[in-house]
Amino acid sequence: MTAITISDQEYRDFCRFLESQCGIVLGDSKQYLVRSRLSPLVTKFKLSSLSDLLRDVVTGRNRDLRVAAVDAMTTNETLWFRDSYPFTVLADKLLPEMAANKRPIKIWSAASSSGQEPYSMAMTILEVQQKRPGLLPSVSITATDISASMLDMCRAGIYDNLALGRGLSPERRRVFFEDAGDGRMKVKDNVKRLVNFRPQNLMESYSLLGKFDIIFCRNVLIYFSPDMKSKVLNQMAASLNPGGYLLLGASESLTGLTDKFEMVRCNPGIIYKLK
């Protein structure tokens, strides 16, 4: 029987490794998360215990195992149109404001996870184009994630009924999806065409991504240390065009982390504009 217990020291060593690789800070009480996320890899890589797996990951003995472990710890499924208001603000304020500049609008979804956020953006753009023909110039979305398996899932754009039921209205399901068989639905090509998925570790340089007018970095900073949060936010400020906007998660704040943005109160919600 495979042992799935780990010692406090093994947990601390793995936490240091994970923070060094992708900035995620687990804290003192997330052993259960490590066990649940990494235990399947013990069998997959034919190891005798979770302790052996953690040792091989931390020492770098097996590169494929390292990649799989980071992938498992950074994989999160999210909701369609999460919190609702960011997409209302995108449709009613940000897109019309950016359209006045008469140049292509570039948007970055900085942690695309299983694809719901960037595809929700794309649906919002298509809805604005339908309601206000001719308003928008070309709009493109760059969606990034550290997880290779999540990016593969995003590009496929196929979701089961459970995933589709998390925040997606029946009307949007009808308009923007097509049947994929086996009770699953696939994002239509006109939605997919707006989104380009790319790998990106938020601890590394963003310069190759180019400049953006709008950045969604929602429910990501909560996993990082204060120093890492500041580094990410200052890099994102440098990645925005003049007058660009940053949208964070509903419970996230810039307080004490960067002075590059000014708060903008919307109805509803709060967003941040580059100074």
Swiss-Prot record:
Which residues are listed for S-adenosyl-L-methionine binding in this entry?
N76, T78, R82, E117, D145, N201, L202, R218, N219
- UniProtKB keywords: Methyltransferase, S-adenosyl-L-methionine, Transferase
Function of the molecule: Methylation of the membrane-bound methyl-accepting chemotaxis proteins (MCP) to form gamma-glutamyl methyl ester residues in MCP.
GO terms for MF: protein methyltransferase activity; protein-glutamate O-methyltransferase activity
**EC number(s) stated in the UniProt entry for this protein:** 2.1.1.80
Catalytic activity as recorded in UniProt: L-glutamyl-[protein] + S-adenosyl-L-methionine = [protein]-L-glutamate 5-O-methyl ester + S-adenosyl-L-homocysteine
Species annotation? Vibrio cholerae serotype O1 (strain ATCC 39315 / El Tor Inaba N16961)
Q: Which Gene3D superfamilies match?
A: Chemotaxis receptor methyltransferase CheR, N-terminal domain, Vaccinia Virus protein VP39
Q: What is this protein called?
A: Chemotaxis protein methyltransferase 1
